[in-house]
A protein has these predicted regions:
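C-terminal beta-strand-rich structural cap/linker in extracellular carbohydrate-active enzymes
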Residues: 428-456
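Aromatic/acidic polysaccharide-binding cleft in carbohydrate-active enzymes
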Residues: 266-348, 360-365
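Carbohydrate-binding surface patches
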Residues: 363-413
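Conserved, mostly hydrophobic/aromatic
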Residues: 49, 126, 142, 164, ...
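Substrate-binding cleft and catalytic face of glycoside hydrolase catalytic domains
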Residues: 44-228
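Boundary/entry segment of secreted carbohydrate-active catalytic domains
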Residues: 21-54
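Aromatic-lined carbohydrate-recognition surfaces of secreted/lumenal glycan-active proteins
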Residues: 31, 163-194, 238-270, 310-322
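Substrate-binding surface in catalytic domains of secreted glycosidases
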Residues: 205, 209, 214-250, 279-292, ...
């Protein structure tokens, strides 16, 4: 086992650029749900939820009467969905997804023709009924479509967005308006180009939040499969670069806007499911990560995003049916039963929910060490440490998990406890050796939480 010693001094801490106060983790961590989302079970993991709310559930076509909360397929959004979620103290974000009115419908352009007035009324009715200023108080934000990308005519999307956003403002000005998925790069199949779709002076006042989706997929051409994913810190994925580019654009062009990552995640299915791959997922040798890696990479992603001037991050997805395909096995639960990631995310929320990111203490190829401080007691600190390494989903040597022994010095206070990343119902303390100046413990690719006595 390798041994590494890391020395820190106060000037080294101050060398890292800090940003304005980060959100508490409880106001940062979110999850993507849907009709069958169980708010009681997933309340253990976070308090922010995002729902895919299809417009074609509400009406048969744009222009039809708007009848919230009951829609044309007889779903009652209050009693069947948002009411249940708010009863468990979830703050809900509504993704008004175009569904069958979107680019998958070859006649989508004609569906929206001459519907500018209806778009305004739809946004107004939605905000007035569901928004925080109304009687029901079921949601606090509305996203105007999910992933229209470059397949949806941009001029048409902008028209829909402007009219719907103005309607939302008229219906409830307290509702935060969120863009569709948009990056500060050229548009692709899943995302719009912030610089073209949302930079116009007429658009900027109509939204409050920039919306990102990012997945740790390899750059094109590295593997046969276009879906191969890697660990969050990997150099062969634009996973974090997408966020950095968007933060930079926001700071320069729209500094008053929040940034939410509304989708990120990892698939992990069972060997039994893998044996049943079919179609392109079999031909191109699609593979997910292991259950342990899913837990590791989700926690590390939350920690990384918290350090990047991002206001929220919603993981995808709440549950899966153990399907061997992209997004088919990305749940925290599998057929309703917790995976290791469920316990890991619940632990992060429980342990650091009242903490906010403070600074990066160390970031090397061998160690990431982040500092978090408690909400109203800034002398209560927690360090989170992990090895920023891992395996790609197409690599088979995944049982050789790396472990090293490290010594940290120049501690801010006396170490109280080290919690190992939780992957089952039981939490585990990690063994460590410490004195007033240093602490030694074993480190792996699973983050650990180093809690200190209050600084005197």
């Amino acid at each position: 086992m390798a041994k590494i010693k890391f020395l820190f001094t106060l000037p080294a801490f101050l060398a890292f650029q800090l940003f304005s106060e980060a959100p508490l983790l409880r106001d940062f961590m979110g999850i993507n749900g849907h009709f069958h989302f169980d708010p009681i079970q997933y309340a253990q993991t976070c308090k922010l939820a995002r729902n895919y709310h299809n417009l074609n559930w509400d009406v048969k076509k744009p222009g039809d009467p708007i009848t919230f909360p009951v829609c044309v397929n007889k779903v009652n959004w209050k009693t069947h969905v948002y009411g249940k979620w708010t009863a468990q103290n979830f703050e809900n974000s509504l993704c008004a997804q175009f569904g069958s009115f979107g680019e998958s419908n070859k006649d989508y352009a004609s569906i929206w023709r001459n519907q500018e007035g209806w778009c305004f009324e739809y946004g107004k009715a939605m905000a007035r009924y569901f928004g925080p200023s109304g009687k029901e108080k079921l949601i606090t934000s509305i996203e105007i479509d999910n992933e229209p990308g470059n397949d949806f005519d941009d001029a048409l999307y902008q028209s829909i967005f402007k009219n719907m956003a103005r309607g939302i403002r008229a219906g409830d000005p307290k509702v935060k308006i969120i863009t569709c998925t948009a990056h500060a790069t050229a548009a692709d199949k899943y995302s719009k180009d912030l610089r073209k779709t949302f930079a116009d002076p007429e658009m900027l006042p109509l939204f409050d939040v920039i919306n990102l989706h990012t997945y740790a997929q390899l750059k094109k051409g590295i593997t046969q499969s276009p879906w191969t994913r890697t660990y969050p810190e990997g150099k062969d994925t634009p996973y974090l670069q997408v966020v950095e580019d968007t933060v930079r654009w926001r700071d320069q062009v729209a500094p008053d806007k929040e940034i939410w990552i509304t989708e990120f995640g990892y698939d992990s299915c069972t060997p039994k499911a893998m044996a049943k791959r079919s179609g392109w997922f079999e031909k191109l040798d699609w593979r997910g990560v292991t259950d342990l890696q899913q837990a590791q990479y989700l926690i590390r992603s939350f920690l990384l995003f918290a350090s990047m001037k991002v206001d929220r991050a919603y993981l995808y997805f709440f549950d899966d049916k153990d399907e061997p395909q992209v997004h088919g096995s990305s749940g925290l639960t599998r057929n309703g039963k917790p995976k290791p990631s469920f316990y890991a995310v619940s632990q992060l929320y429980r342990t650091l929910g009242d903490y906010r990111f403070e600074r990066i203490i160390k970031r090397t190829e061998q160690l990431y060490l982040f500092e978090f401080s408690k909400e109203d007691k800034r002398n209560h600190l927690c360090w989170v440490a992990w090895m920023p390494t891992g395996f790609r989903s197409d690599q088979l040597a995944q049982k050789n998990h790396r472990i090293t022994e490290i010594t940290l010095t120049d501690l801010p206070a006396k170490p109280k406890q080290i919690l190992a990343m939780q992957t089952s119902e039981q939490t585990q303390n990690k063994d460590f050796v410490s004195n007033s100046k240093s602490i030694t413990f074993k480190l792996s690719e699973s983050p650990v939480y180093l809690l200190f006595e209050p600084i005197k």
